[in-house]
Amino acid sequence: MDIDIVDLDHVAVRVSDLDAALEFYHDLLGMEIRDRQRYEQGEVPYVAVVAGGRHIHLVPTDEPIDVSSGHLCLLVRSGEMETEAEIEALIEELRAAGVTVEDGEPYERYGAYGRDWAVYVRDPDGRRVELKLH
């Protein structure tokens, strides 16, 4: 088999409350919204949020959602945050907005672009989301 994977197009995640998910990913984290009108017109089963050209499809469902394993990792531009103190300030802003931040955060972690400060938070469905400096 001769397959040449060149990039990631999207990841789909089920959400129990689309408005709460958009408040988290768009309003709090600043991700661009795409396909909302197409969703509302019934053309697609999701609303996308976008970071760096990569899409997360938020797929509303009434079925139970299992978020007990895995996580999403979103890169935060390091030009805006370069120190532990700055990511601590971000954590306080997220907590003030009602976002659950895991105990013991922030922490330096390795990722696709090396080691840097990161924090694990939970989205409205309890899904683990890593915000990692880049």
Task: Briefly describe each language-model feature range.
Residues M1-D19, L72:
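N-terminal beta-strand motif that seeds the catalytic metal site of vicinal oxygen chelate
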Residues L18-D19, C73-D125:
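Vicinal oxygen chelate
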Residues E32-E40, P106-Y110, H134:
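Conserved catalytic-core motifs of GNAT/GCN5-like acyltransferases
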Residues E40-P45, D66, A112-R115:
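Short acidic/glycine-enriched loop/turn segments that link adjacent beta-strands
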Residues V59, P64-S78:
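Helix-adjacent hinge/juxtasegments
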